[in-house]
Amino acid sequence: MRNAIEFITDIDNDAGDIIFSKFIVSAHISDIHFPVMDPRKQYDILCKQFIDRLRQLQQLDLVCINGDLFDHKVMTSSDATYYASLFIAKLVELCKEKRATLIILQGTISHDNNQVKLYYHYMEQTDVDVRVVTNIQFEVVKNSVVLCIPEFNNLPEEVYDKYLNRSGFYDMCIMHGNFKGAVYEDSPSNSRIFTMEDFCNCRGPIVSGHIHKPGCYSDHFYYCGSPYRWRFDDDHDKGFVLMVFDTVSRTYQMQNVLIESDIYRTIQMDGLLNDAKDTIDHIERFKKDNHIDYLRIKFTGDVDMASKMILNNYFRDREDITLVYYSNEKEMQETAEKRIVEQSKEYWFLLDNNLTDMQKFVMWVNSHAETDNYITEDELNVMLSG
């Protein structure tokens, strides 16, 4: 895969005699989520593998944070705010150097929590072009019209209709949200699910945040993905999107630029390998040989209490090793629930209000009969009266 510099250089060379200024070169990153892990570590990754790469580009016109700069509401005095603000400051300096526009888009409200407003003051500076976007609106960048769509909960459809269908053509869209056919298609959500029909007035690509796996849907809708990995069960490529958009022909080229990220892996073990010591040696060797940063071991069989204590004590202070032991509690719960369902089917008549107490009693007696000689209600009355 070409790196970002080769990507832009190839576009430049392919342009021939056409003036290179007809192109818009943009970088898109999303779902940064300060402080989902050590914010200093996040900051270092973003500086070395995002900002430093962009600095090497011959041309850079637009940098977009496509939502979820923050993971949750944080205190202004926290390390999360400190390193997030350092990152934004570095981006502002880069954009000043490159004479590029920086757009910071609000993402999911439960993540960003309007905290992107911390950077409103950059919009007052006259030596750099920064736009902090918290509402649906159009922005003009290098004579191109860009539709910006943050994620909202329960926003009236007429608001979307106004910008998507009744405001004329636009050149590209940057957003944060759900697209039909992506991960969250069938998940209950208060935010809107978009389709390609919503973008019939868009004359270029749509680049979005929200889904942590990079991908393309319906040919022109792109997810940036997240820039790094911080949890198990996430083995997707990590990085950001680099785009070159031809404002004359309306064609574009996209590249997913990879960022090296921690490797999270989960393995299953039936039980111990001979004893606790051999199991520990196996875990350590497997992690080292496979260059795994964070390893989770799920024991699918029983492990005796003494061995559990040895394993837990050895890995007690290891954040890079997670042990999950087999438990039959869930199995017992499922069995109990199944028994309840079976009994409710067997004794459904006890809850039938159309039956008399005597009829219910007769049915209960017959349900416990050891033979097929069932009694009737009249027979039971005779037995009770005798």
Which positions does each model-derived feature cover?
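N-terminal active-site segment of His-dependent metallophosphoesterases
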Residues: 1-86, 160-169, 374, 385-386
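Accessory, non-catalytic peripheral segments of nucleic-acid enzymes
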Residues: 2-21, 245-386
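Beta-strand-turn-beta hairpins that frame and shape the catalytic cleft
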Residues: 17-27, 138-148, 167-172, 219-221, ...
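Divalent metal-coordination and catalytic microenvironments
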Residues: 31, 68, 107, 146, ...
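Active-site environment of divalent metal-dependent phosphoester hydrolases
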Residues: 33-37, 71-74, 103-116, 139, ...
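A short helix->loop->beta-strand "cap" motif at the edges of active sites that frequently abuts
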Residues: 97-102, 201-204
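Conserved catalytic scaffold of divalent metal-dependent phosphoesterases
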Residues: 103-197
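Conserved beta-sheet core of the metallophosphoesterase superfamily
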Residues: 185-250
